[in-house]
Amino acid sequence: MSNTPLPSSFDAHPEFFQETKWQKFTRRIKEEPLIPIGYAATSYALWRAYKSMKAGDSIELNRMFRARIYGHAFTLFAIVAGGIYYGQERRQRKEFEKALQQKQDQEKRDAWLKELEIRDKEDKNWRQRHAAIEMAAKEAEKKRG
């Protein structure tokens, strides 16, 4: 059997989805708060450099360009250090998410099979009723004729 998920009317069910993009974004910011600080420092340095350039202050402009480089270095350091520090936790989280995905896929498959069984049962009941009605119609026709 292939690993592709089976189609079902349960696809849009909210209990099959675990973490939204916003939840992931906030979780990642909480895990590594230094990266957004580095982004903010770099952006602030660029904004101050722009203001200095407009004012014609070349000394402040050069200071802000250096500050931008320091902000980039800080951000890069935060990314690398966070990657090293949280590497094991990320691997464990990926394993957990994989196991969770397998469980959800199995639940979807089970729900899909249950739905198919219900539909099959309804179809059999309908066929039996239709056959009974057809038999009754034939008997009624025999009695007339």
Curated annotation (Swiss-Prot):
Residue ranges of domain HIG1 in the record: 6-97
PROSITE patterns for the chain: HIG1
Membrane-spanning segments: 33-50, 69-86
Subcellular location per the Swiss-Prot or TrEMBL entry: Mitochondrion membrane
A GO biological process held by the record: mitochondrial respirasome assembly
Coiled-coil segments on the chain, per record: 86-144
Keyword Signal appears in the UniProt entry: no
InterPro entries on file: Hypoxia_induced_domain, RCF1
Signal peptide start-end: none
Superkingdom of source: Eukaryota
Keyword tags: Coiled coil, Membrane, Mitochondrion, Transmembrane, Transmembrane helix
Homology family: Belongs to the RCF1 family.
The protein's name: Respiratory supercomplex factor 1, mitochondrial
Organism ancestry: Eukaryota, Fungi, Dikarya, Ascomycota, Pezizomycotina
Primary gene name: RCF1
